[in-house]
């Protein structure tokens, strides 16, 4: 809704990383290993990708970050680069709900169609509604991986709420 209303692109580091993984780039291969183990890709890689992306023409009138920044270093790098934010939104969801939602997700890789075993099940269990092909659970949606990612979130990302609430001056969210 926001991207359509303002005519701006959504910038998702997760989508950018998945595209690199699918393409089999060196960054993609490195990222896949880290993500599959429940870790976060190094800040320097993410920051570089984001800076490159927001320099593109379709971002000249703005953009919507999705899942970025995730660490204090990423947030500070954006401030240092002069990237001003109009607003920062935190969506607070209990860990148990996140684990349930992510670990129940199933994907048809060829099309990207996404299902959920409880909330959006396919017509035939484990099969894509359109093609009848198998659905898979991505490695990063497996319960133990989701729990590891949540632990990393609590350690590295929760501090951003405090960072943005205290940010002052020209770079503070308006």
From Swiss-Prot:
What does the sequence similarity comment in the record state about its family? Belongs to the adenylate kinase family.
Q: Carries keyword Kinase?
A: yes
Give the gene name.
Answer: adk
Highest classification ranks of the organism: Bacteria, Pseudomonadati, Pseudomonadota, Betaproteobacteria, Neisseriales
Q: In which pathway does it act?
A: Purine metabolism; AMP biosynthesis via salvage pathway; AMP from ADP: step 1/1
In Swiss-Prot or TrEMBL terms, this protein is called Adenylate kinase
| Subunit structure, as described in the record | Monomer.
Instruction: Identify the NCBIfam families for this entry.
Output: adk (TIGR01351), PRK00279.1-1 (NF001379)
Q: Which GO terms describe its cellular component?
A: cytoplasm
What EC numbers are recorded for this enzyme? 2.7.4.3
What S-S linkages are listed for this chain?
Answer: none
Q: Outline the segment boundaries, as ranges, of region: NMP.
A: 12-41
The main enzyme category here is transferase
Which Gene Ontology BP terms does the record give? AMP salvage
In this chain, ATP is annotated as bound at 105, 114-115
């Amino acid at each position: 809704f926001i991207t359509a209303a303002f005519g701006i692109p959504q910038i998702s580091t997760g989508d950018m990383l998945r595209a690199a993984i699918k393409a089999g780039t060196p960054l993609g291969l490195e990222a896949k290993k880290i993500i599959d183990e429940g870790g976060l890709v190094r800040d320097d890689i993410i920051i570089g990708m984001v800076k490159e992306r927001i320099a593109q023409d379709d971002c000249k009138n703005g953009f919507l970050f999705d899942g970025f920044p995730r660490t204090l270093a990423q947030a500070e790098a954006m401030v240092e680069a002069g990237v001003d934010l109009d607003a920062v939104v935190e969506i607070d969801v209990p860990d148990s709900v996140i684990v349930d939602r992510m670990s129940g997700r199933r994907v048809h890789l060829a099309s990207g169609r996404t299902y959920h075993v409880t909330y959006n099940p396919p017509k035939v269990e484990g099969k894509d509604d359109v093609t009848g092909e198998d659905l898979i659970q991505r490695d990063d949606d497996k319960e133990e991986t989701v729990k590891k990612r949540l632990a990393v979130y609590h350690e590295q990302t929760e501090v951003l709420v405090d960072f943005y609430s205290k940010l002052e001056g020209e770079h503070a969210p308006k």
